[in-house]
């Protein structure tokens, strides 16, 4: 006989996602699908979506950590767009990367030009005498 009868063959291994294989939280399969559907290239290698998902995950974690620090500095427990704006604009590299990006409800960085500040005069010393 061929040996393919009712003998209990090896059970199929549990499916493991490419994200878990790579140790990522971001979806490698979805990134791969979007790369294929986006007409960026005729073919997409197997490593490209893994690398791209890892880069996206790293950038997201970096921004969220800085935004969480900004929220904590403002004594808040929830990150709002203002905290994202402060985090990105105060970080030199992220500001360069996202320089042309507008964040809705983000506001602006607090900045007063030095010439507009009141001058420190000698009158304070004269009053104390």
UniProtKB/Swiss-Prot annotation:
CDD domains: HFD_H2A. Pfam families: Histone, Histone_H2A_C. The modification Symmetric dimethylarginine is found at residue 4. Residues 7-19 have a biased composition (Basic residues). There is a cross-link at residues 14, 16, 120 (Glycyl lysine isopeptide (Lys-Gly) (interchain with G-Cter in ubiquitin)). The modification N6-crotonyllysine is found at residues 37, 119-120, 125. The modification Phosphothreonine is found at residue 121. GO terms for cellular component: extracellular exosome; nucleosome; nucleus. Keywords: Acetylation, Chromosome, Citrullination, DNA-binding, Hydroxylation, Isopeptide bond, Methylation, Nucleosome core, Nucleus, Phosphoprotein, Ubl conjugation. The modification Citrulline is found at residue 4. SUPFAM superfamilies: Histone-fold. GO terms for molecular function: DNA binding; protein heterodimerization activity; structural constituent of chromatin. The modification N6-acetyllysine is found at residue 6. Deiminated on Arg-4 in granulocytes upon calcium entry. Monoubiquitination of Lys-120 (H2AK119Ub) by RING1, TRIM37 and RNF2/RING2 complex gives a specific tag for epigenetic transcriptional repression and participates in X chromosome inactivation of female mammals. It is involved in the initiation of both imprinted and random X inactivation. Ubiquitinated H2A is enriched in inactive X chromosome chromatin. Ubiquitination of H2A functions downstream of methylation of 'Lys-27' of histone H3 (H3K27me). H2AK119Ub by RNF2/RING2 can also be induced by ultraviolet and may be involved in DNA repair. SMART domains: H2A. The modification N6-(beta-hydroxybutyryl)lysine is found at residues 10, 14, 37, 96, 119. The modification Phosphoserine is found at residues 2, 123. Belongs to the histone H2A family. The nucleosome is a histone octamer containing two molecules each of H2A, H2B, H3 and H4 assembled in one H3-H4 heterotetramer and two H2A-H2B heterodimers. The octamer wraps approximately 147 bp of DNA. This is Histone H2A type 2-C.
